[in-house]
């Protein structure tokens, strides 16, 4: 099963590399990115709000939360208490890039309140890919676990539907599927959670130009902007590098956009098709190798 291992490594590294490549351009417009960096195609020192807080090649809260998810997973599903405790420990280190929704939700978790926050930001979708890997062969179980893992911070129908969509596309990529018919299948998979958002994903079929897509859906932090844009980037490009470069130069919530794209594209193209310089330049990659191996064993045992 070399191929499956390569795909799972690809998904995990794709997500983390996307996060680290997109970190310096996060919260900037397309024009500001051009002015500050030119065209970004490698790791650069951040000149945005993370300047002096993170260094080039480092990841953000997107990956920190995904790591907590991976550490709390068993083949039976997610240990919610363990996941909550990991998020609390991470928050208490005062990370420079924690989102407001996550901060509020984790404060509630500290008081044993698991009801989450009613926010449609993409915090659930950005961390969800490990579930798409482990439960790629059981969509019913995948749905249950995604809802459970999302609700404790983002108790909002659009946030949950967006997380389900990303997990669905990751699971499909591991099965070598990447085509527009997946949009209809995804619609059927998530419409009971948020039909309006599910319909929005179907609109991706109307486009063949990513610049138009980013203008139409947006690339901001809201789930109904960044998730359709990430899925569209994945479906409309045909190699890992091309889609990644689009994401990190798009403006907006670039680290989440690129991370979600990377999780899907990495699962489809595999680790061997990720540019070597992006793997080499990633900080603390041995941690990511270990976590990817853990997911591989959970997904295949």
Curated annotation (Swiss-Prot):
Keywords: Hydrolase. Its EC number is 3.2.2.-. The keyword Hydrolase applies. GO terms for molecular function: hydrolase activity. It is an enzyme of class 3 (hydrolase). Coiled coil: none annotated. The keyword Cell inner membrane does not apply. Belongs to the ADP-ribosylglycohydrolase family. This is Uncharacterized protein MJ1187.
């Amino acid at each position: 099963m070399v191929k499956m291992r390569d795909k799972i490594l690809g998904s995990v590294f794709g997500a983390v590399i996307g996060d680290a490549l997109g970190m310096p351009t996060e919260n900037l417009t397309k024009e500001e990115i051009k002015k500050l960096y030119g065209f970004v195609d490698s790791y650069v020192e951040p000149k945005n709000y993370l300047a002096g807080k993170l260094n080039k090649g480092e990841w953000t809260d997107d990956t920190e939360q995904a790591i907590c998810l991976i550490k709390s997973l068993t083949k039976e599903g997610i240990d919610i208490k363990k996941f909550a405790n990991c998020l609390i420990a991470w928050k208490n280190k005062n990370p420079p890039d924690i989102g407001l929704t996550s901060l509020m939700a984790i404060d509630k978790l500290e008081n044993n309140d698991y009801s989450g926050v009613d926010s449609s930001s993409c915090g659930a979708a950005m961390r969800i890919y490990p579930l798409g890997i482990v439960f790629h062969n059981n969509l019913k179980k995948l749905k249950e676990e995604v809802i459970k893992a999302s609700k404790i911070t983002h108790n909002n129908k659009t946030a949950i539907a967006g997380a389900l969509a990303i997990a669905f596309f990751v699971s499909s990529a591991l099965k070598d599927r990447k085509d527009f018919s997946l949009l209809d299948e995804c619609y059927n998979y998530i419409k009971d959670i948020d039909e309006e958002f599910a319909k929005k994903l179907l609109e991706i079929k109307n486009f063949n130009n990513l610049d138009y897509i980013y203008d139409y859906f947006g690339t901001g932090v809201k789930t109904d902007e960044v998730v359709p844009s990430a899925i569209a980037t994945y479906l409309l490009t045909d190699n890992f590098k091309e889609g990644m470069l689009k994401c990190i130069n798009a403006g907006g919530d670039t680290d989440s956009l690129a991370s979600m794209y990377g999780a899907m594209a990495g699962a489809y193209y595999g680790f061997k098709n990720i540019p070597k310089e992006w793997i080499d330049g990633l900080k603390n990659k041995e941690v990511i190798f270990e976590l990817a191996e853990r997911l591989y064993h959970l997904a295949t045992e």
